[in-house]
Amino acid sequence: MDYLKRYPQIFISLICIASYLPFANIGFLSDDFTFLRHYQSEGWGMISSNFYDAFFIPVTHIIQLILLDVFNQNAFLIHITQIILHFYIAVLIYRIAIENLNFKPYSAILSSIFFILIPYQSEAIFWFSSIGYQCCLMLTLVAIRSYFKDQILSYCLFFILSIHSKEIGYTTPIFIYAFSYFAKEKKKNLYLLYSFLIVILSLISRYLVLGELVGGYGEITHLNFQLTSILKVIGGYFIKFFSFSRYATSSGLLITQCLLIISILTPFILHLIKNRKFNKMGLWLFIFCICILPVINLEITSINMIQSDRYGYFASVPIVLFFGSAVSFLKNKIKIIVTAISISMFFFMTILNNQKWIGASLLAENYLSELSKVLSHEKKVFLINVPDNFKGVYVLRNGVRDYLSMKNIETEIYIWKFQTFKQLNGGIQFRDKTLKEYNTDTYFEKYSSNLYDFISNCDLILYYNNFTFNKIDKLSFTIN
């Protein structure tokens, strides 16, 4: 235990390596190919077009360009970098917890380990398009540390960088004042003034680049703060982080998981209530809600599947701090047992997640490779089914046309259905001249109207099944 307290970074790094390094050979997926196509054709010239992004996050995209240049578009080395970022963020959480939030060493170390292992982080680590969430959280935590060290220039620099990595960075001043209250530090009003000026200047530059203040998915999505929506999403994230229902294979296991978590958290909560520390509970809840507000109107499919886990990357910080505090509050022998069980369970769940990412990568690689082999001189090709996701992990919701463009294949592609693959050898079967779905769910249709007009103008109809493409005769093509 003494060794753990003296060298926490070593222990945290070993857990991070064991959890993620074996899976770093995951390739590029979905939206990655869109960015890669523009990078291949324009390189750093993408800056003049705001990187073809509806959001204004230039710092993230500049970091992406640097990584693509330095590592020559090697996905393995890029994911190694993302794993290192994840480790560094965990170390920052440890430092802030022990130096500024008055956590005991055991609580601080445990919080950092939980951040590494909580089984919702894989999307932010293994999807190149999600690296902005890592960059923003890292820069936000560095800005918070600068605030506590009273380094105003450093704070301003990292605050500016964080809000231009991801819009959630705008919440940084709220975090520092909330943490100041928790640490009983005197608030530094000069920081509030500088933060206000930075936000104003950032919004002006944002408007000049995007032509609007909101951007992204638009005002209807981002500014729709209906009370019912807010309560529903916050409730959804509570279910996600406090039940781990996604990993329960039966209702009995789900009940067991919930009872276990309640039994761990109850002594700590009762202690706070007994000592009338309602302000700390309220503060924790406030920080958790602030972490969710920037993504409040975005999908929360991550309760049941991996998809959209990146939206909870920020919110996982107050969660792991709370878990770390609760576990360390238990009596010594019970604490050690609960720590061992928690770390083992989180590690196992994370490995299960990462294996799905490996599957998605294999599916994307095979699909694109086989498609490239099939296409020769066709002008128009109709694709029956494109893998949208594999067990929740994005595969090729976007990117098919971008990949072919990168390979200088000029065939015009029509896509009928994007589908969820539940197993790698899923796809479509074509029996008795009828198209039937096989081990797959339709996600959405792109060309549902005048379908046969599209088909009649195509040179080739292809469907994907069991890792191979099959051709369909246009004259015999019917839909079940």
Task: Label every model-predicted segment.
Residues 2-480:
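Polytopic membrane enzymes that build or remodel cell-surface glycoconjugates and lipids
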